[in-house]
């Protein structure tokens, strides 16, 4: 399998009963080695950063609450705070301001306002859950031809803002569908003529719009550009840099902890065929929530996802069909007594898996929150059964229909395991009601799950074919609907695009649950985009993920 949660490949032919022929994956080794094991947390430095943040934090709070500030400037400030990853620090203040500004909104007030300002205001509202009408962009279209005015192409900042705004579109917002295509084409043609910070911003946005990027990385990239702006608030820039450096120390310590745990578990010795991807998995989980209060949650979710990598690569790159059947049965039983029935090489993993979950359940039972651990465990059992089904398909040469593939493929995408495991350490916000909402499989969750499956398939299907993997969504779509490969990929991309619109809708007020619970769902879709937009970034992490890990964990932000 090329990705965490992709389809499994199992060879069943053997040379003899004692010497099975196994798949050969030849996964690239870790590019990091033991680099992050050597980190030593300087608590005094963290305290210094925390203390140093207090003054600029107070100054930024005053700016947000300033009653004399023009509404456009206020929305620009709020948008910048959000881009810098600081919204959680001022959530109540920002929500109070946006409540007031949204109630006061009048389309007529925007008649003389420029495209850049309107785009900034639109994003400030939409990113934070307020459904500002896309009619604010109507004035930039020709009424006779219903096309965008060519005059806006001279306003590069405005076009960039419109392009970013279009990523927040909902179903039926045709003007934003058109805006996305129009601005992308124009910006691509102009980018080579631009210079300085603006050129960098356009390149970054075309590569990956902010809305589909990893929040921590986007914040780091944004303050590098923000410091070049003449209208910047120095207190906000200072806070952003201190905040980044503070988080970096905390997160490097978390990465050291999970790296040491991985080494102590000796998985690379007992299951040497697996991918060694500790920093990459930690990065993935960090993409779900970066706030300091979720430190324990990140450590727990990283460990569980690393368990998933071992399981996945065992099904995909080592085990025979007979061994997979035995392992699946053992995971369904979830009983140490089942260890004798599974191959010896996977027994250490099985014991550690059961022990870690038992310890987690014991710890959270004291807080009355063991149900989140149980939900994670059940998701782990589900994915084992899903992997087995794909293995049986591969073993028999069966290509599933697209609906049949998707029913199982949404399970084997690993989305359910990762998303439910992300809840385990989040604390009191994961109440019984919150878990019940999650288990109801709401539309936003379905949409994020679909992106996880299909984005992976679109990027990895060729590699999967070359390795003799079971059929992907691309293959299933071709078989079911009798279309060409290109047509199948185009249709899957449309499904992904529509799923993003459903996620956008699900994040708007009124919400069924708090944004604290919605954010990991949104951010997991974002991380799928990060990992699979241009390549299989997990199996071959030497490009995007290496760049991100270097940016976040190697070297601090210059003050």
UniProtKB/Swiss-Prot annotation:
Its cofactor is Mg(2+). Mainly expressed in sunflower trichomes. A motif (DDXXD motif) lies at residues 312-316. It is an enzyme of class 4 (lyase). Pathway: Secondary metabolite biosynthesis; terpenoid biosynthesis. GO terms for biological process: diterpenoid biosynthetic process; sesquiterpene biosynthetic process. Mg(2+) 3 binds at residues 456, 460, 464. Binds 3 Mg(2+) ions per subunit. Mg(2+) 2 binds at residues 312, 316. Its EC number is 4.2.3.23. InterPro entries: Isoprenoid_synthase_dom_sf (IPR008949), Terpene_cyclase-like_1_C (IPR034741), Terpene_cyclase_plant_C1 (IPR044814), Terpene_synth_N (IPR001906), Terpene_synth_N_sf (IPR036965), Terpene_synthase-like (IPR050148), Terpene_synthase_metal-bd (IPR005630), Terpenoid_cyclase/PrenylTrfase (IPR008930). Optimum pH is 7.5. The keyword Lyase applies. Mg(2+) 1 binds at residues 312, 316. Keywords: Lyase, Magnesium, Metal-binding. It catalyses: (2E,6E)-farnesyl diphosphate = (+)-(R)-germacrene A + diphosphate. GO terms for molecular function: germacrene-A synthase activity; magnesium ion binding. Sesquiterpene synthase involved in germacrene A biosynthesis. Germacrene A is a precursor of several sesquiterpene lactones. The Asp-Asp-Xaa-Xaa-Asp/Glu (DDXXD/E) motif is important for the catalytic activity, presumably through binding to Mg(2+). Belongs to the terpene synthase family. Monomer. This is Germacrene A synthase 2. It comes from Helianthus annuus (Common sunflower). The gene is GAS2.
């Amino acid at each position: 399998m090329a990705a965490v949660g992709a389809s499994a490949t199992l060879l069943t032919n053997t040379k003899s009963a004692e010497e099975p022929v196994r798949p050969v994956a030849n996964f690239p080794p870790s590019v990091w080695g033991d680099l992050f094991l050597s980190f030593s947390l300087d608590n005094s430095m963290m305290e210094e950063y925390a203390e140093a943040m207090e003054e600029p934090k107070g100054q930024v709070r005053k700016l947000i609450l300033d009653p004399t500030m023009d509404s456009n400037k206020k929305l620009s400030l709020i948008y910048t705070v959000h881009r810098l990853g600081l919204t959680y620090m001022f959530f109540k203040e920002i929500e109070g301001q946006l409540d007031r500004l949204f109630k006061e909104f009048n389309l007529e007030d925007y008649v003389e306002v420029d495209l850049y300002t309107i785009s900034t205001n639109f994003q400030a509202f939409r990113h934070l859950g307020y459904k500002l009408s896309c009619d604010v962009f109507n004035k930039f279209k020709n009424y006779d031809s219903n096309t965008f005015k060519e005059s806006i192409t001279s306003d590069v900042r405005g076009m960039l803002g419109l392009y970013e705004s279009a990523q927040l579109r909902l179903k039926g917002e045709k003007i934003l569908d058109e805006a996305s295509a129009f601005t992308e084409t124009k910006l691509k043609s102009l980018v080579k003529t631009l210079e300085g910070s603006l050129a960098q911003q356009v390149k970054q946005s075309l590569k990956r719009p902010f809305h589909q990027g990893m929040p921590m990385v986007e914040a780091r990239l944004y303050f590098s550009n923000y410091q070049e702006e003449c209208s910047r608030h120095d207190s906000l820039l200072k806070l952003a840099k201190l905040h980044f450096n503070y988080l970096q120390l905390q997160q490097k310590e978390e990465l050291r902890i999970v790296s040491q745990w991985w080494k102590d578990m000796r998985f690379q010795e007992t299951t040497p065929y697996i991918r060694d991807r500790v920093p990459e998995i930690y990065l993935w989980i960090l993409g779900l929530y970066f706030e300091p209060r979720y430190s324990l949650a990140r450590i727990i979710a990283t460990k569980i996802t690393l368990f998933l990598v071992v399981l996945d690569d065992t099904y995909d790159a080592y085990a025979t069909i007979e061994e997979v059947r035995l392992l699946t049965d053992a995971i369904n039983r979830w009983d140490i007594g089942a260890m004798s029935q599974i191959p010896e090489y996977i027994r250490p993993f099985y014991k550690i898996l059961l022990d870690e979950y038992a310890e987690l359940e014991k710890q959270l039972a004291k807080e009355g929150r063991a149900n989140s651990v149980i939900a994670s465990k059940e998701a782990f059992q589900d994915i084992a059964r899903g992997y087995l089904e794909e293995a049986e398909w591969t073993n028999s040469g069966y290509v599933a229909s697209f609906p049949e593939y998707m029913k199982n493929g949404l399970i084997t995408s690993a989305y359910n395991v990762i998303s439910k495991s992300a809840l385990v350490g989040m604390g009191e916000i994961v109440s019984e009601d919150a878990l019940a909402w999650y288990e109801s499989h709401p539309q936003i969750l379905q949409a994020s799950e679909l992106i996880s499956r299909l984005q992976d398939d679109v990027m990895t299907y060729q590699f999967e074919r070359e390795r003799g993997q079971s059929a992907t969504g691309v293959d299933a779509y071709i078989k079911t609907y009798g279309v060409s490969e290109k047509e199948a990929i185009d249709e899957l991309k449309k499904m992904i695009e529509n799923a993003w619109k459903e996620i956008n809708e699900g994040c708007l007020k009124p919400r069924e649950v708090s944004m604290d619970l919605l954010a990991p769902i949104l951010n997991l879709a974002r991380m799928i985009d990060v990992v699979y937009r241009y390549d299989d970034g997990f199996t071959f992490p030497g490009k995007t993920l290496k760049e991100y890990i270097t940016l976040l964990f190697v070297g601090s932000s210059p003050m």
